[in-house]
Amino acid sequence: MRKLKSKRKNYQPDPIYQDTLVTRFVNHLMKDGKKTIAYRIFYNCISEIEKTKKNGLKIWKEALDNVMPHVEVRSRRIGGSNIQVPTQIPPYVKVTKAMKLLISCARERNEKKMYKKLAEEILSAYKKEGAAFKIRENIHKMAEANKAFSHLKF
């Protein structure tokens, strides 16, 4: 067990929107340290969303809110059986899980270009449909089903 909690990293705001949330998203999107390519994918994705005559950044943030899980289930061993215990997720972790969920579901889509995959997944999450939203709903259903064990501490 670690002695001290690790310090949370301070992120620089991104060059266009001056938003640290965008930088965090781009860091999760990045592969093999290629940050400029990740920024290009994100900005192309936002411009693709703006073709629907709406503010791309607002749609992206609302899609993140729609995909964000509020509870999760964690396994705990009690009396020889594993029990799924629903627990609250801290706000910082909620955002991280939402970002990773959105990106992983976008990577599984069938479009050719990554920015189009990401744009389609963001738009579907904005409309409360799509793979990422379904996964979030499944997480919440599991937590609801195991609500009886919520009194157990993890």
Curated annotation (Swiss-Prot):
This protein's UniProt keywords: Ribonucleoprotein, Ribosomal protein, RNA-binding, rRNA-binding, tRNA-binding
One GO BP: translation
Transferase among keywords: no
Cellular component, GO annotation: small ribosomal subunit
InterPro entries for this protein: Ribosomal_uS7, Ribosomal_uS7_bac/org-type, Ribosomal_uS7_CS, Ribosomal_uS7_dom, Ribosomal_uS7_dom_sf
Record's function text: One of the primary rRNA binding proteins, it binds directly to 16S rRNA where it nucleates assembly of the head domain of the 30S subunit. Is located at the subunit interface close to the decoding center, probably blocks exit of the E-site tRNA.
Subunit structure: Part of the 30S ribosomal subunit. Contacts proteins S9 and S11.
HAMAP family registered for this protein in UniProt: Ribosomal_uS7_B (MF_00480_B)
Protein name listed in UniProt: Small ribosomal subunit protein uS7
